[in-house]
């Protein structure tokens, strides 16, 4: 089936006046082609095309990063001229340098944050736990002057006698 499809494509290209120019190859072996604008046999104007023939023919084997960023920009028409191999290698080297610098920065930041967090945090304080969180009340209840109400239970405030001195005045 594969060779018959290729034969049909070759026959169709010869009839449709579609000319495929080889523009370049990347370090992974992918080949890039440019097909200029042309008129087909019905007189329709077919706009230019930019095509990549992947080194691994199966779409299943494709992984992100198999096509360099510069070539991808050329295929998507965000870049007018195809990239050179020197440019791709220079940009790859630049990306590696940035990756190394960011890793160094991350390590320094980690050390600084560890030092400052040790300086800023107070030592842990021993807390005394009274009762249990699920208990409705725990510990010694002190009588309060103010009445308290929680749902259906009402607790009137307790009576506290005044000092004798303030009562006589």
UniProtKB/Swiss-Prot annotation:
- An example of a Pfam family matching this protein is NDUFA12
- A GO BP annotation: negative regulation of insulin secretion involved in cellular response to glucose stimulus
Transmembrane regions listed in the UniProt entry:
none
Asked if the Swiss-Prot or TrEMBL record annotates the protein with the keyword Chaperone, the reply is yes
UniProt keyword list: Chaperone, Cilium biogenesis/degradation, Disease variant, Mitochondrion, Phosphoprotein, Primary mitochondrial disease, Transit peptide
Start and end residues of each stretch annotated as Disordered: 116-169
Please state the pathology the record ties to this protein. Mitochondrial complex I deficiency, nuclear type 10: A form of mitochondrial complex I deficiency, the most common biochemical signature of mitochondrial disorders, a group of highly heterogeneous conditions characterized by defective oxidative phosphorylation, which collectively affects 1 in 5-10000 live births. Clinical disorders have variable severity, ranging from lethal neonatal disease to adult-onset neurodegenerative disorders.
**Per the similarity annotation, which family is this?**
Belongs to the complex I NDUFA12 subunit family.
Protein name (database record): NADH dehydrogenase [ubiquinone] 1 alpha subcomplex assembly factor 2
Species source reads Homo sapiens
């Amino acid at each position: 089936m594969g060779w018959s499809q290729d034969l049909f494509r070759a026959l169709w290209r010869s009839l449709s006046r579609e000319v495929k120019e080889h523009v370049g190859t990347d370090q992974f072996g992918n080949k890039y082609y440019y097909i200029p604008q042309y008129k087909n046999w019905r007189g329709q104007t077919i706009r230019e095309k930019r095509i990549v023939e992947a080194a691994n023919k199966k779409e299943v084997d494709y992984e992100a990063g198999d096509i360099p960023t510069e070539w991808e920009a050329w295929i998507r028409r965000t870049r007018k001229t195809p990239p050179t191999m020197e440019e791709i290698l220079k940009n790859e080297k630049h990306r590696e340098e940035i990756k190394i610098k960011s890793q160094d920065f991350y390590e320094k930041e980690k050390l600084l944050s560890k030092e400052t967090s040790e300086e800023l945090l107070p030592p842990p304080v021993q807390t005394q736990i009274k009762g249990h969180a699920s208990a409705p009340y725990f510990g010694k209840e002190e009588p309060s002057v103010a009445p308290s109400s929680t749902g259906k239970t009402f607790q009137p405030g307790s009576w506290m006698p005044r000092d004798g001195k303030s009562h006589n005045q």
